């Protein structure tokens, strides 16, 4: 099934409502509105997109093919590039690096750089905290403090050291991506559009508990890979691990996924944390195989 095109309304607001606004995180349509507000020609939107997402500048004055007057107007209207460097970085012995960025609600958010032979993956956050309350998740225990804007998501991608060498992106950091879908879709549009970073959607994976309406929207409007948190094939057991089983039963999630084709470019995977003595025996294995029978997918077992 080919994805249906969907017009994303950018989270852009005029300066009469807010004191300042970052340019990163704005789609081409959002940048066109910026250009119109500042009296710039419409083609300036693509120029700004190139500076922001390809050349990755950090200051408006670096946009040298915009006139001095246009750059002054951007600053006058309170626009900034909006890039913020990581607050801290902590490297593990395996080369993994955890970066902390300023988040929302007074809480920092994490991004994790994961090197692996010829790949360089960045795991990004979509929220500060999480509302899903999974019993095994440290983020859930911190409570929910707010959702990131598209600017907050894009800043992670653009501002980690060596960001130009990234090969893959996974939405598997703090938060539930489908609980903050509009900014996530805006970020994906920026990353995969020709006017933006021009990545193939095959380089992006979104991990989710499976909010049904939002999952359908993601499937219909993008071609990114999907990873579903499952952790048990038994509803009662999964409910104890993941309270969202009550609102979004895994059987309904799988029923929705069966309506889509994962046999070609798009990949479907299921994330399964193995808890010793709880969900790691032969009975669980057979039931999981039965549940997923006929789906073109893989299961990632996590210890």
Regions found by a protein language model. Give the residues of each.
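Basic polycationic patches enriched in arginine
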Residues: 4-6
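Flexible, acidic/Gly-rich N-terminal and inter-domain linker regions that tether
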Residues: 8-120
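Short, structured patches in soluble enzyme cores that scaffold and shape functional sites
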Residues: 113, 124-128, 138, 157, ...
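Canonical Radical SAM [4Fe-4S] cluster-binding loop centered on the CxxxCxxC motif
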Residues: 115-152
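Ferredoxin-type iron-sulfur electron-transfer modules in oxidoreductases and energy-metabolism complexes
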Residues: 151, 155-163
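Conserved AdoMet/S-adenosylmethionine-binding subsite of the radical SAM
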Residues: 161-168, 173-303
